[in-house]
Amino acid sequence: MSLKSTKTFFLSFFRELFVYHHTSLEFRAKLFASMIASNKVDNSCEYLVLKKIAKEIYKDDEYRVDVLVHTTKEYVNKIIQNDLLDIDHLLLDIDKELKRHKRFVNKINMNHLRSFYACNGDEETILLQTRILEFYESEINSRKRNG
């Protein structure tokens, strides 16, 4: 394991202590995980898209990029392994986070989330991702109306 990957693992594991604004990063990871985990076939394309998006968000912070990717993968793996987490529970958790942290609605970038459409192939994935995006759009509109 290289020094960089060791540091990324360490920062990811202890992100609550060592990563500035870890709740914001965690929220973004959940958003991306919901889109990635909806594709049951293969996630390699999604992880390339995720890395690109993470670099756009955290331009000059390579470790934050790596921690976001690592954290997202953790959530996806929990969903895939059905380790007490599924997409429905993840979406409910995102909804709770939005209620708790009003500013998080500004973290939802629909263009970033739509980028994952480029990776899907089957109809079921497209339908599920569309429903997830509709949920996020509804949350954005609801939060902006209710201030």
Question: What are the residue ranges of the model-derived segments?
Answer:
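Small-residue-enriched hydrophobic alpha-helices in membranes
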Residues: 1-34, 41-147
